[in-house]
Amino acid sequence: MFDPKLKEALGRVQKPGRYTGGEPGSIYKEKDKVDVRFAFCFPDTYEVGMSFLGEKILYELLNSHENWWCERAFMPWLDMKAEMERLQLPLYTMESKDPLTAFDAVGFTLQYELSYTNILAMLDLAGITFYSKDRDDRWPLIVAGGPCACNAEPIADFFDIIQLGEGENQLPSICAEIEKAKKEGISKKQLLLNIAKIPGVYIPAFYDVTYHEDGRVKAITPNEPGIPARITKAIIKDLNQFAPPTNFVVPMVGAIQDRASIEVLRGCVRGCRFCQAGFLYRPMRQRDASLLNKAAQDLCANTGYEELSLSSLSTSDHGQLEELLDDLNEWAPKEHVSLSLPSLRVDNFSQSLIEKTTKVRKSGLTFAAEAGTQRLRNVINKNVTWDEIEKTCTIAFNAGYTSVKLYFMMGLPTETMEDIEGIAETAQKVVDLYYKNTNHAKGRGVQVTISCACFVPKPHTPFQFVPMDTAETLQAKQKHLLESVHSRKIKVNYHDSTTSFLEGVFAKGDRRLAPVIVEAYKRGCYFDGWEECFKYDTWMQTFADMGIDPAFYCQRPIALDEVTPWSHMDYGITHEYLVREYNKALAAQTTPPCNRACNACGANHLLGGPCFDYSQNLV
């Protein structure tokens, strides 16, 4: 039975299904019979959050413990947020409809820097005080994890616990400590000291940060005995020990990615110098084809989905991919399930691969060229040539494809306007290739879409040292790209440079940004990642009023020996390796994939030995 206030709110908003719960696959327990209650919060809309595979993994994992209950909460859209404030209806979870203050722990996933004000909005709607130092034992523990945890310093003061790395072992260990503390009456501080012993757990309150007079970080030091100077990320050494989820909560309102999805591998061997995920999730580990096939079949049967995505950073690098596709195609066509590989590589795309992924339904193909010239692709270590792009597109056109999306970035280190023109030239070559190919689909034209992101330098990558292009420079490059495209067969999409600027500020920011984020939220900034909601002028005025220069964080070079806000976080990649790759980038020198030869990045120490068996002649 809905609370009368909730019922009233639902009658006044668009898409009330975002807020009702009760979806197939939801897990319900008797709250009086569980020892730990965990609220998994996604700081964006229901449609975005329900597309997130990580939530599905941890939801099933935590709820597999009989005496723990993991529930879900999402950021309400503008209309529902206003109704909740008007009716004084606190933010609640989808399953029990209880307010977040009723939980032992409230966890946020940090997927995107521009979600930070949404985190504050959710805490505010829940009636939870923002700063960790102001919350005593009566409050839920506020937890964070996800890729942005690699430098969560701009929001570190809001969290009691930040998880670095992979959560499959971490989060259950945290819940076990919470359960123990409740039974033994342990204080919040002692509980945090106990949790700090869990691999990959960072307790921001146990570290002090000092600064040089010029604003750079001077030192980050522990302030409690036994706290490590550096926190090493948690890692799952053998993914086969954690089978993919075989049941999903099926959304009432269509999610952005509303399909069955299984993670076939984690990490990446490619070493693209711009790609933060490729460094954060090293080393690459894959699941066995037989395990994946069974999980996929069970997942589709349990959810009724008719599309299956084989997800990872680089699915076509899976060593048993063709074997897996053969296994999947034994049953998928009979069940009217289509297969999609969202992360295909130009350099290992094959006729056999395309045949095995188009037996039920064709869709457009997407490839990441990243840069418009070979020189710049070498700089960023994107080991792809035009010959490989040509071969791949020819295979696709022969198979009947008429739509190709090409991903690029602009604002890359050493980039010139010639490189921008190369983006348009590459797309035009693909159009020309289609019409030169006598086997292309008859009676249909080709559509090539250029999707161009603004490059944002990120921590733990070789490009963390480089300054980001200004918004004005990026806008000039975007204009030049549009002027360089002359075919109606080519469509150009690009990111807003001002939102990318703010992303860059938070990506490399420090703890002094926390008050700015709070003040910007109070001035009406939230849903910053949504173009229709982004208030750039409000952000800039807030920075100015608080005496903070945002360009200091993202538009100045970082010295190779500088202490960064994330220097105390160890993701397995050595500083020496990042410097070496940075210098190779400036010389336009490439580095081979690490499954062909070890490049001594340091990640092997996380596994306690070599990442790959090189005697197997891996490709």
For the regions a language model picked out, list residue spans one by one.
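A glycine-rich phosphate-binding loop feature that marks nucleotide/adenosyl-phosphate handling sites
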Residues: 194-205, 313-318, 342-348, 411, ...
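A short beta-strand-loop structural module common to alpha/beta enzyme folds
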Residues: 67-79
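Canonical Radical SAM [4Fe-4S] cluster-binding loop centered on the CxxxCxxC motif
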Residues: 52, 254-290, 597-618
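N-terminal pre-triad scaffold of radical SAM enzymes
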Residues: 38-44, 62, 248-273, 300, ...
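Radical SAM enzyme core and accessory elements
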Residues: 1-27, 38-40, 486-619
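N-terminal [4Fe-4S]-dependent radical SAM core
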Residues: 7-39, 46-47, 204, 210, ...
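Glycine-rich beta-alpha loop elements in corrinoid/cobalamin-binding modules
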Residues: 76-222, 459-510, 517-532
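Conserved SAM/AdoMet-binding glycine-rich loop
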Residues: 40-41, 105, 114, 298-405, ...
